[in-house]
C-alpha cells in the first residue's frame, strides 16, 4: 500500500480498462480551470517520490534519473509528518475529509476492488 498515490489540485479519472500509459485522464485543475499537458506545474511530494522512489518520475513521467535533482526547487530538512503535527498543534483539532477529486472507472470494476481492499486493510 506504500505504492498507492493520489494527487490533489487536479480532478481526474483512472480508467482501469485502458492500456498502460493511458489510464489517467485529467479533467481540470481542482478550481475548474483548464489543465494543459504543455504547461509546467510545481508539484509537492514526499522525499521517497521526489528522489525517484517507485519509478513514478522515471518510468511513469519519463524523466531521466539524472534530471530529477535539477528539477527540485525546495527540499525541507523536516519530513511531512512534522508539518502535519505542527498544523494539528496550531489548529487544536482537525476534521479531515476526502477531496473527492478522482475516481476509478468503470464502477463495475472499481466497487468489487474497493470491497476487497477494505477487507484486506480493515478485516471487514
Regions found by a protein language model. Name each.
Residues 1-124:
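Catalytic centers of hydrolytic enzymes
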Amino acid at each position: 500500500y506504500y505504492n498507492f498515490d493520489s494527487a490533489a489540485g487536479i480532478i481526474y479519472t483512472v480508467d482501469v480498462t485502458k492500456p498502460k500509459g493511458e489510464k489517467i485522464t485529467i479533467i481540470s485543475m481542482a478550481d475548474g480551470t483548464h489543465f494543459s499537458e504543455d504547461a509546467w506545474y510545481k508539484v509537492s511530494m514526499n522525499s521517497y517520490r521526489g528522489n525517484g522512489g517507485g519509478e513514478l518520475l522515471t518510468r511513469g513521467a519519463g524523466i531521466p534519473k539524472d534530471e530529477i535533482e535539477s528539477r527540485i526547487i525546495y527540499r525541507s530538512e523536516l519530513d511531512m509528518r512534522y508539518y502535519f503535527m505542527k498544523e494539528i498543534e496550531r489548529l487544536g483539532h482537525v476534521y479531515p475529509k476526502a477531496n473527492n477529486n478522482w475516481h476509478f472507472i468503470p464502477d463495475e470494476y472499481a466497487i468489487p476492488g474497493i470491497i476487497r481492499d477494505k477487507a484486506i486493510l480493515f478485516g471487514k
